[in-house]
Amino acid sequence: MAPHVLVVPFPGQGHMNPMVQFAKRLASKGVATTLVTTRFIQRTADVDAHPAMVEAISDGHDEGGFASAAGVAEYLEKQAAAASASLASLVEARASSADAFTCVVYDSYEDWVLPVARRMGLPAVPFSTQSCAVSAVYYHFSQGRLAVPPGAAADGSDGGAGAAALSEAFLGLPEMERSELPSFVFDHGPYPTIAMQAIKQFAHAGKDDWVLFNSFEELETEVLAGLTKYLKARAIGPCVPLPTAGRTAGANGRITYGANLVKPEDACTKWLDTKPDRSVAYVSFGSLASLGNAQKEELARGLLAAGKPFLWVVRASDEHQVPRYLLAEATATGAAMVVPWCPQLDVLAHPAVGCFVTHCGWNSTLEALSFGVPMVAMALWTDQPTNARNVELAWGAGVRARRDAGAGVFLRGEVERCVRAVMDGGEAASAARKAAGEWRDRARAAVAPGGSSDRNLDEFVQFVRAGATEK
């Protein structure tokens, strides 16, 4: 039987992007690959995974998608039930045909996929859309090998909030303060269901079980070495469209993953064309984070004080919080631009961009490294504090902003300090720019033919082919 891999991402932009790119690369290796999306996304968005194929299943919200759910918990519960049945039907419909599925690769947050695959007799391989470091923290925490230090005491002292304690001498993780750990290990926040999924996503995996990571060996060498003691962990990233990965621009000339759930603005790249090289601060906090009025004002004042042109992405749902009265002059004179969305890969690839003010979601972090853009890391929650720590301390590709403990926000002076640190041309800026450029070269080498991630993908292809032969 010929191998045929079914790729099942979580139906959100940040989770789909790397798995669409993975599906493309796997298919380019000569393995039949089908990417699964939802019926709502298939109808409302242009998903191009060529040379992989695309099939749609039900997530229980066929008419309105995630936005039609009463909340996150309701969506996930209904999705698990509907998608389990729909995915099983898709697999069963092909079971006796020449293009039957022989393996499933699924987003590690989609824990409902594993029992479906097992019931169908298919090997199931989790794909982590987060860093190896964050995944390792979740995994070791779930296994009782990592102890989280306590938070601040009631009297205001640190309450012993020192480094996270590892019960074994070498797990590949550096010592981290409580504030540098993924927040879900000590605070489930407003999404307890997602927090538990994060912590338990690899709990079932054993030493011989494949786990694929959207990272590359050179970036997270020690962490990967630690993970391979417990899992068959392989880095196959960065799953970012890059020239060395066979990337070709779309019909509109853009660098694209192939799945845009939000229509980007065109005007921002034309605005960037008018700016000198490395002169613009690009500011974006992803598709989920909501900064609030106070943080938006501090951010605006800090960016203005830094004196650099800036391109700021603010979701349409949060646009009413933008302090327009502060930005009126800057936007009128072309010193600033505020847009609801933009083609981020094109922006990061643009020579005018000198730094990326980012929440340090893993996709954004990996994209900045892949395009050699220094970062100002303003982590908010979940995996972001760990990524921000590594941007500054492990990779030297930017600086971390420190949140004011009393105000609970990043103050304007801290924003100004960080932007100037990576853009003013001093020693720190030169070092960050040099490191970012070196990581860009390593990232592209990793996915180029014969690179570390390319070799790991070839190893996975061999596993898939061997499994199909046995059927």
Curated annotation (Swiss-Prot):
Keyword Transferase in annotation: yes
Pathway(s) annotated for this protein in UniProt: Plant hormone metabolism; auxin conjugation
Domain of life: Eukaryota
Catalytic activity: (indol-3-yl)acetate + UDP-alpha-D-glucose = 1-O-(indol-3-ylacetyl)-beta-D-glucose + UDP
Cited SUPFAM superfamilies: UDP-Glycosyltransferase/glycogen phosphorylase (SSF53756)
EC number(s) on file: 2.4.1.121
CDD domains: GT1_Gtf-like
Cellular component GO terms held in the UniProt record: cytoplasm
List of residues binding UDP-alpha-D-glucose: T129, Q344, H359, W362, N363, S364, E367, D383, Q384
Binding site for an anthocyanidin: H15
Pfam families, per the entry: UDPGT
InterPro entries for the chain: UDP_glucos_trans (IPR002213), UDP_glycos_trans_CS (IPR035595)
Keyword terms, alphabetized: Glycosyltransferase, Transferase
Catalytic site: H15, D107
GO molecular function, one term: quercetin 3-O-glucosyltransferase activity
Coiled-coil portions: none
Similarity comment: Belongs to the UDP-glycosyltransferase family.
Full protein name: Indole-3-acetate beta-glucosyltransferase
